[in-house]
């Protein structure tokens, strides 16, 4: 089993820890919790770069090794890093539990060393008709991020 972790933080007080586990060539399970967010839906993605030198802005675009358009997690054609939305409760916290087969922890398309990002707004899953729908899901600014690192 391969395990990874990302510790999320931001200047706005958003914080959390996200865990990634993968058995063999099976899907990757994403679990953890994030606090300090405004209630509602927030886009949740793996971005291409593990670079936070300029905060979450330097994490690059969504992880997209196949060069696809943005989509929903259940879409066959999507960015590998498109994990959809997380639903934040009235207390500002969310418990994450996602199983996804496009974000492996090993091999040429591994997400180790990349970043997980929480956005300010809902991800329209590529279906909103906005000019940004097919690239970012029009999910707004980046409110928190963390680099995905290998865990022992």
From Swiss-Prot:
Its EC number is 1.15.1.1. Its cofactor is Cu cation; Zn(2+). SUPFAM superfamilies: Cu,Zn superoxide dismutase-like (SSF49329). Gene3D superfamilies: Superoxide dismutase, copper/zinc binding domain (2.60.40.200). It is found in: Cytoplasm. It holds the Pfam family Sod_Cu. Cu cation binds at residues 45, 47, 62, 119. GO terms for molecular function: copper ion binding; superoxide dismutase activity. InterPro entries: SOD-like_Cu/Zn_dom_sf, SOD_Cu/Zn_/chaperone, SOD_Cu/Zn_BS, SOD_Cu_Zn_dom. The keyword Oxidoreductase applies. CDD domains: Cu-Zn_Superoxide_Dismutase. Its main location: cytoplasm. It catalyses: 2 superoxide + 2 H(+) = H2O2 + O2. GO terms for cellular component: cytoplasm. It comes from the Eukaryota. Zn(2+) binds at residues 62, 70, 79, 82. Binds 1 copper ion per subunit. Keywords: Antioxidant, Copper, Cytoplasm, Disulfide bond, Metal-binding, Oxidoreductase, Zinc. Belongs to the Cu-Zn superoxide dismutase family. Destroys radicals which are normally produced within the cells and which are toxic to biological systems. Homodimer. This is Superoxide dismutase [Cu-Zn].
């Amino acid at each position: 089993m391969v395990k990874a972790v990302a510790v999320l933080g931001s200047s706005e007080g958003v914080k959390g820890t996200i865990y990634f586990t993968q058995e063999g060539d099976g899907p990757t399970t994403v679990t953890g919790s994030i606090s300090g967010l405004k209630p509602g839906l927030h886009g949740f993605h793996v971005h291409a770069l593990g670079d936070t030198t300029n905060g979450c802005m330097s994490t690059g675009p969504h992880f997209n090794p196949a060069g696809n358009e943005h989509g929903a997690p259940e879409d066959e054609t999507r960015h590998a890093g498109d994990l959809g939305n997380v639903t934040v409760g009235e207390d500002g916290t969310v418990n994450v539990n996602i199983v996804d087969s496009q974000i492996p922890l090993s091999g040429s398309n591994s997400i180790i060393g990349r970043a997980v990002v929480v956005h300010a707004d809902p991800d329209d899953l590529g279906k909103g008709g906005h000019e940004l729908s097919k690239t970012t899901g029009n999910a707004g600014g980046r409110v928190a991020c963390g680099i995905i690192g290998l865990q022992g």
